[in-house]
Regions:
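Terminal helix-turn-helix DNA-binding modules in bacterial transcription factors
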Residues: 46, 50, 55, 59, ...
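Key DNA-contact positions within bacterial/archaeal DNA-binding proteins
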Residues: 70, 120, 135
């Protein structure tokens, strides 16, 4: 009878160990999925960094990578703390600032180089983001450079 009890206890213990292992496995799967999601979002961000100056359709990007648009936007927002569209706009404005600072291209040329088809829309968006027009931004850079060289 004592052997039977210890045999039953042993079975219960093995069963508990099995449950613990299964529980640990279920906890690990989301991590792998999260890592995969992070890799997918990093690839998306890299794609946007390389192609920000072209017309990018978030819907087409998501569909071509077998993602629903809502899932893609939600996961990208978790990855980058911004939506894909805002991320692309930010890349465009950042690169426009660099071009305004380092080139003599006019506003229309810069607008086209950073992916805007409409220079007026570009100027309005730039003003909204930076608090001044692209022309004012460039003039401010010239004034700052002149005052620093004195």
């Amino acid at each position: 009878n004592l052997q039977r009890i210890s045999y039953e206890e042993m079975l219960v213990n093995y069963f508990m160990i099995l449950l613990i292992h299964l529980h640990r496995l279920t906890l690990q799967k989301p991590r792998k999925k999260n890592l995969q999601n992070m890799n997918e979002m990093e690839q998306a961000a890299q794609y946007f960094r390389m192609h920000y100056n072209k017309a990018i359709s978030i819907e087409n990007y998501a569909a071509s990578h077998n993602m629903s648009i809502s899932w893609f936007i939600q996961n990208f927002r978790q990855y980058a703390n911004t939506t894909p569209a805002q991320y692309i706009q930010s890349l465009r404005v950042t690169n426009a600032k660099m071009l305004l600072e380092t080139t003599d291209y006019n506003i229309t040329e810069i607008s086209n180089l950073v992916g805007y088809e409409n220079p007026l829309y570009f100027s309005r968006f730039f003003r909204k983001q930076c608090g001044m027009s692209p022309s004012q931004f460039r003039k401010q850079l010239v004034l700052n450079t002149a005052s620093q060289s004195k």
